[in-house]
C-alpha cells in the first residue's frame, strides 16, 4: 500500500541482508593529482547506548514549504526479498532498491530529478575521461541538468570512526578515497558527493565559497556517516539521502540568482556550495544578511512554492519593484511551458 514519503523516510530497510565483508581498495592514478581531505567537520554522533547513530543536519538548509509538498507524495515500500552484498554492484543495487527508489518519488516534479549511471556531466562542455557511478541531476533542460549530488559505490571501505574523528590519516585507503571523491567533485563541478560501501553512507559537502575552492586542501568539508544498521531511534539512510538531495537542490536554486538590487544593495556574490546570496556593507565587509537589517527591520527571502523561486520580503510583506512585481532573488525552478 502506498504511504506518504515522509513515513518511508523515517523507516529503516527491513529486508534481510547477508553481508560478506569483502573489501575493495581504491588507488586510482588520476586521483593522485587532487589533495586529500584534511579539514573534516563531523555531523553524526554515537548515542550513550553505543549503538544509535544520530545525525545533525544544521549544516544544510532547513526544510521549506516545497519539502512539505514533496514528502506528502505517496510511494511504495520495497518488496520483500533477501540480499547478499558481495560486490560493489550488489551494494549499488541494494541502495537503489532500499533507499534511492524510496526517495525519488518525492522528486518526480517540483523539481524533476533524473538519476543516471556512469554518465558525463551534462552541464559542462569540458571533456573528462572518468565517470562517477551515480548522478542525480535536474531533469528539465531549462535548468541545464545541473547535478544535485554525485556518488560512488565501494565495498566495505569506509572507516566511520576515522571520518567522524576528522582524521583519516596521511596515507592508505581512506586518504585515497578522499582524493577520489574530491576529484569527482572537481570534475563534475559538484560539492555534494556521497559514497556507499554496503555498510555506511558517507555524505560530503565541500564548503567551497567558489568552484575553484574545491581543489584547495584547506577547503572545509562537512561529513555525515550513516550506518546501514541502526536502531529505530537513529538516522535512516533514506532521510539522510533526502536531505542531501534537498541541499544539492538549494545550491542549484540559489546559483540561478542574479544581482537584483534589494533596496539599493545588490548581492555581491553567491556562496557556491550553498547558493546563498552574500552582501557587502558600506565598510566592505561581506555578510549573509542585508546590510540594512536591524533588530526591528529586516529583508529576508521566502520561497514561492508555485514556481520554486525565492523572493524578497521586508518586515512580513512582499518586497515589490516599481512596477508592482515581486523582487525575486532566484529564477523559477519549475512550471516551465511545455516544449
Describe the residue ranges of each PLM region.
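Eukaryote-biased feature marking scaffold/signaling PDZ-domain proteins and nuclear chromatin regulators
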Residues: 129-131, 144-151, 172, 176-179, ...
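Conserved catalytic cores of phosphodiester-cleaving nucleases, focusing on short active-site segments
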Residues: 95, 99-103, 134-136, 145-164
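Short amphipathic alpha-helical interaction elements and helix-loop-helix interfaces
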Residues: 105, 109, 113, 140-143, ...
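Short amphipathic alpha-helical molecular recognition features
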Residues: 83, 87-91, 95, 126, ...
Amino acid at each position: 500500500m502506498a504511504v506518504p514519503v515522509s513515513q518511508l523516510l523515517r523507516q529503516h530497510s527491513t529486508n534481510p541482508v547477508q553481508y560478506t565483508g569483502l573489501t575493495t581498495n581504491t588507488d586510482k592514478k588520476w586521483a593522485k593529482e587532487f589533495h586529500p581531505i584534511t579539514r573534516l567537520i563531523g555531523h553524526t554522533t554515537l548515542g550513550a547506548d553505543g549503538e544509535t547513530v544520530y545525525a545533525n543536519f544544521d549544516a544544510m538548509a532547513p526544510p521549506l514549504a516545497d519539502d512539505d509538498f514533496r514528502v506528502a507524495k505517496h510511494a511504495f515500500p520495497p518488496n520483500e526479498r533477501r540480499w547478499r552484498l558481495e560486490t560493489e554492484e550488489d551494494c549499488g543495487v541494494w541502495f537503489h532498491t532500499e533507499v534511492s527508489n524510496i526517495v525519488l518519488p518525492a522528486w518526480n516534479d517540483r523539481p524533476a530529478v533524473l538519476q543516471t549511471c556512469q554518465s558525463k556531466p551534462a552541464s559542462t562542455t569540458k571533456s573528462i575521461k572518468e565517470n562517477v557511478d551515480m548522478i542525480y541531476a535536474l531533469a528539465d533542460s531549462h535548468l541545464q541538468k545541473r547535478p544535485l549530488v554525485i556518488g560512488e559505490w565501494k565495498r566495505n571501505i569506509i572507516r566511520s570512526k576515522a571520518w567522524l574523528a576528522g582524521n583519516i590519516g596521511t596515507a592508505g585507503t581512506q586518504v585515497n578515497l578522499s582524493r577520489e571523491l574530491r576529484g569527482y567533485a572537481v570534475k563534475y563541478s559538484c560539492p555534494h558527493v556521497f559514497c556507499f560501501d554496503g555498510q555506511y553512507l558517507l555524505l560530503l559537502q565541500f564548503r567551497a565559497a567558489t568552484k575553484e575552492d574545491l581543489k584547495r586542501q584547506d577547503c572545509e568539508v562537512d561529513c555525515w556517516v550513516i550506518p546501514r544498521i541502526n536502531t529505530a531511534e537513529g538516522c535512516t539512510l533514506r532521510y539522510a539521502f533526502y536531505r542531501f538531495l534537498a541541499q544539492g537542490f538549494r545550491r542549484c536554486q540559489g546559483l540561478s540568482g542574479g544581482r537584483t538590487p534589494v533596496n539599493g544593495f545588490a548581492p555581491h556574490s553567491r556562496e557556491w556550495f550553498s547558493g546563498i546570496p552574500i552582501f557587502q556593507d558600506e565598510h566592505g565587509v561581506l555578510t549573509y544578511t542585508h546590510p540594512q537589517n536591524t533588530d526591528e527591520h529586516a529583508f529576508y527571502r521566502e520561497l514561492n512554492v508555485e514556481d520554486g523561486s525565492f523572493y524578497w520580503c521586508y518586515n512580513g510583506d512582499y518586497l515589490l519593484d516599481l512596477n508592482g512585481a515581486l523582487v525575486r532573488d532566484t529564477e523559477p525552478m519549475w512550471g516551465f511551458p511545455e516544449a
